[in-house]
């Protein structure tokens, strides 16, 4: 047997070991009946099923699904590649979603482990490369991502990261120009999988190359490598550009509170016992990797140390001390440090493979340390986050009661299962879903959850009607936490036509008798405009929040349709024009109430003044002073604990003092009017905020009087039967009753920027309003032209860089 044949035989043995191990893992999951596990997994499995069913119909990229969040663009904000992979596995399994999930472990295990074997073959370190290939899937954070978090796109990126690192190493260290193509393709595929992780991969590569430059001076190739990676991301522009407009990416980008939850002290991230005691979702990085990295820094040759140094630096960045610095950096939203773990592991493995002078006996010790550290990760049952049979049964019962759509008001306490159990297995429409940040009705969902938290059930049931939900589920545990009983909310449910029809083990189900499919025609009594408008509607459901915070975005005619206008945290572009609009609205008979605590500062004099009334800062401790209102003394409750040190504002400049309070020897005004503005009220002291926060009855009585609308009042809602037909490329809506075409019918379908129609469309509270008896709507790919331009530009830039790279390389050789 020749040396060449021997090498091929060894290579085949290494790859066969990987395939057998992957098959063993998948076989274990299949034979044990391993349930899909992880906090997010059922939401991702639902999207996988949607992709599979769309592909069966010949629709390669479904633009719209009606089942979650009153309608959502499922694959606009979540990269589609992982769902294509799952759909492919479902084709192999004859549509068996659970079997496809179990086979996915084989795919990720083998595909993710293969680069390390190829690396070992390249460096003639087959045993170590094979060991790393087998271990990659079982690294602590990878197991957590797969079985505890259940984040399918992240699971797929863990198998792409090794390829990106391998091609980066081949291009920079081995001067292999062909590797640039692999690097480019890897970044494109990662972009189509999880955009934020792709950005983190780019940041990791930059930091690694920066560290490596200390020992290996090759600025040119490193810059070119980063350019190729950027070109790969740009080439995915056809999907990336639409995904950046709103939705999940934007929400994640600004969420520093989430970033702070992904920070752990070293006593947690390096303590193998704490993970076992603290729970399966605790972040454990791996003590063995850190010990080996320290040894590598001390003993390896300088040119091989970058991966070890990178590990220690990035691990330090996961600590609370580093968070205080990271949060102040530009693009700090990228520094979700635990998401760097696959990249840290990858560069660490690469450093170990580069450490060619490490003797075999020490390689065995290295492998033993990593094995011992990861052995607990092989107990898959420990990481399992399973769904209870009780939850599955209750979702089945709920769907049987539902005609059009259901709302499960559970604050995600059921986990992600309802997103599949309601919409996936029974194809019932669902007001909620999973990962609300990608939903057009995201604000509506937040308000429903706020209403539950603050016990505003009157608002909750009313808005459930608006969202088209004929059934509403409320968990018993939420009522118990609030120390209220079902009888306490019966009146609020009945006010919107709901009655309790089924008591389940853990929840109550409310039902309203409705047409099979219905929309609503609604008459709101009041309009709230400004930053805090949504919050006030919790207490005053007869008000609707305006679509803009800017006064000039409304016409006098539009505002005059309402009985009362409440302004809180509003804005204007031109103060004089805004004041003129409100003056005309008041003259037309609409009551205008201005929350003077939140008046914009005048651009010229920086004073908080509007319509000649000024807001003057004041400070209270514990509670408001005694308030004088209509010859009565009002004593309010104490402030909430977090508001005990309360800064607010009283008002000056009014002609008529309606509400006052005494501060020392001064009588100050909190409610007043001007003689030349007989229908305009100026309100101070942030009374609305306190009334909403604490349901202070004394303050609510004042506000009811000032607004001219009771907090018990609901909007006038008329249910209108409609017929909706969904197609792959659009939908049609028929209104089966007479209605005022100017007002239109709220269809309860989430309004989308991909809807186009020859008939008039509008939106109210993020929901689609139609104005004709028959409406045909087509779906158009969002931002197609700018997306395709970026894609073509990225590919052209890549080709140009390749040509420049090859040309410069040839010049160097000559």
Residue ranges of predicted features:
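Membrane-embedded transmembrane-helix bundle of lipid-linked glycan/lipid transferases
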Residues: 1-386, 390-395, 453-458, 467-477, ...
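Active-site-proximal, structured, solvent-exposed surfaces of multi-pass membrane proteins
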Residues: 2-8, 530-531, 710-814
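Extracytoplasmic
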Residues: 114, 176, 368-676, 682-697, ...
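Active-site proximal loops enriched in glycine and acidic residues that flank catalytic Cys/His/Asp
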Residues: 191, 201-203, 237, 319, ...
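A glycine-rich phosphate-binding loop feature that marks nucleotide/adenosyl-phosphate handling sites
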Residues: 248-252, 410-417, 721
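Hydrophobic, well-ordered secondary-structure elements that form the walls
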Residues: 343, 356, 406, 472, ...
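Short amphipathic C-terminal alpha-helix that caps PH/PH-like domains
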Residues: 347, 695-710
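Short, solvent-exposed coil/turn segments at beta-strand boundaries
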Residues: 467-468, 654, 674-679, 727-730, ...
């Amino acid at each position: 047997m020749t040396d060449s044949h021997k090498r091929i035989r060894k290579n085949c043995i290494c790859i066969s070991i990987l395939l057998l191990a992957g098959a063993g893992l998948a076989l274990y999951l299949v034979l044990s009946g391993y349930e899909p596990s992880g906090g997010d997994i059922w939401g991702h499995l639902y999207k996988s099923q949607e992709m599979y069913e769309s592909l069966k119909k010949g629709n390669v990229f479904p633009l719209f699904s009606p089942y979650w969040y009153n309608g959502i663009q499922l694959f606009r904000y979540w990269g589609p590649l992982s769902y294509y992979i799952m759909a492919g596995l479902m084709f192999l399994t004859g549509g068996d979603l659970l079997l496809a999930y179990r086979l996915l472990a084989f795919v990720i295990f083998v595909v993710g482990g293969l680069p390390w074997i190829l690396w070992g073959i390249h460096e003639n370190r087959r045993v170590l490369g094979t060991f790393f290939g087998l271990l990659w899937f079982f690294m602590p954070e990878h197991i957590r991502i797969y079985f505890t978090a259940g984040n399918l796109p992240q699971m797929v990126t863990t198998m792409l990261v090794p390829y990106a690192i391998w091609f980066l190493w081949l291009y920079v260290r081995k001067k292999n120009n062909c590797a640039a193509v692999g690097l480019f393709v890897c970044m494109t595929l990662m972009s189509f999988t999880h955009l934020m992780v792709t950005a983190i991969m780019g940041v990791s590569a930059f930091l690694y190359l920066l560290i490596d430059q200390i020992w290996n001076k090759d600025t040119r190739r490193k810059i070119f490598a980063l350019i190729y990676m950027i070109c790969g991301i740009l080439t995915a522009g056809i999907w990336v550009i639409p995904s950046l407009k709103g939705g999940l990416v934007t929400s994640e980008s600004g969420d520093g509170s989430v970033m702070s939850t992904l920070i752990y002290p070293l006593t947690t991230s390096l303590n193998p016992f704490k993970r076992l005691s603290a729970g399966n979702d605790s972040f454990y990085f791996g003590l063995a990797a850190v010990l080996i990295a320290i040894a590598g820094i001390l003993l390896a040759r300088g040119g091989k140390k970058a991966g070890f140094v990178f590990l220690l630096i990035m691990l330090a960045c996961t600590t609370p001390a580093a968070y205080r610095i990271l949060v102040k950096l530009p693009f700090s939203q990228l520094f979700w440090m635990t998401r760097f773990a696959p990249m840290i592991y990858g560069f660490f493995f690469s450093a170990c493979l580069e450490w060619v002078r490490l003797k075999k006996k020490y390689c065995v010790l290295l492998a033993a340390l990593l094995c011992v550290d990861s052995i607990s990760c092989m107990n898959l049952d420990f990481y399992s986050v399973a769904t209870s049979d009780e939850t599955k049964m209750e979702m089945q019962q709920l769907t049987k009661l539902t005609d059009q759509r259901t709302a499960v008001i559970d604050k995600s306490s059921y986990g992600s299962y309802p997103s599949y159990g309601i919409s996936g297995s029974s194809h019932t429409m669902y007001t909620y879903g999973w990962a609300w940040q990608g939903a057009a009705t995201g604000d509506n969902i937040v308000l429903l959850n706020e209403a539950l938290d603050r016990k505003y059930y009157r608002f909750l049931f009313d808005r459930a009607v608006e969202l088209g939900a004929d059934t509403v589920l409320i968990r018993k545990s939420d009522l118990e936490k609030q120390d209220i009983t079902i009888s306490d909310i019966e009146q609020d449910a009945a006010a919107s036509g709901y009655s309790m029809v089924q008591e389940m083990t853990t929840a109550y189900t409310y039902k309203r008798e409705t047409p099979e499919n219905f929309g609503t025609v609604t008459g709101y009594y009041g309009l709230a405009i400004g930053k805090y408008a949504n919050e006030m509607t919790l207490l005053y459901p007869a008000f609707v929040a305006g679509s803009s915070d800017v006064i000039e975005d409304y016409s006098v005619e539009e505002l005059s349709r309402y009985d009362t206008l409440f302004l809180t945290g509003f804005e204007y572009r031109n103060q004089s024009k805004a004041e003129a609009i409100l003056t005309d609205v008041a003259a037309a008979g609409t009551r205008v109430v201005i929350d003077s605590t939140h008046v914009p500062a005048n651009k010229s004099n920086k004073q908080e003044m509007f319509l000649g009334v000024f807001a003057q800062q004041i400070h209270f401790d514990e509670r408001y002073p005694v308030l004088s209102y209509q010859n009565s003394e009002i004593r309010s409750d104490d402030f909430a604990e977090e508001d005990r040190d309360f800064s607010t504002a009283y008002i000056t400049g009014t002609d008529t003092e309606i509400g006052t309070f005494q501060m020392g020897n001064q009588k100050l005004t909190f409610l007043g009017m001007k003689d030349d503005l007989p229908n305009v009220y100026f309100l101070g002291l942030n009374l609305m905020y306190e009334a909403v926060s604490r349901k202070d009855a004394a303050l609510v009585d004042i506000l009811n009087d000032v607004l001219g609308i009771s907090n018990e009042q609901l909007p006038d809602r008329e249910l209108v039967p409609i017929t909706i037909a969904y197609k792959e490329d659009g939908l049609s809506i028929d209104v089966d009753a007479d209605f005022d075409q100017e007002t239109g019918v709220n269809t309860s379908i989430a309004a989308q920027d991909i809807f186009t129609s020859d008939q008039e469309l509008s939106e109210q509270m993020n929901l689609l309003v139609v104005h004709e008896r028959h409406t045909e709507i087509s779906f158009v790919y969002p931002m197609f032209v700018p997306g395709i331009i970026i894609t073509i530009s990225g590919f052209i830039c890549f080709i140009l860089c390749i040509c420049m790279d090859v040309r410069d390389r040839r010049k160097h050789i000559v």
